């Protein structure tokens, strides 16, 4: 199984707006499970750490293989979510690995 992990840090904005953006992003990501068959499992977590190096959101998703990850990457619903991510995310880190 292939694990795809993405950690994101949102752009600096007022606390309430950041909270709204995080909730919207989490909702958009969680909805992908309903549209992309190759996506076998997905978890979205919102950070509660106050460390200055902490990211704001983590996405953990599982795929059978690299073909499934590619189907996810180019799927219209995922591309739509990426458009929102580009608007609100300042930094993202990705790790893909086999389990």
What is each PLM-predicted segment?
Residues 1-56, 64-71, 97-99:
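Short S/T/G/P-rich N-terminal loop/turn motif that feeds into the first structured element of a domain
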Residues 66-92:
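C-terminal structural segments of small proteins and small subunits
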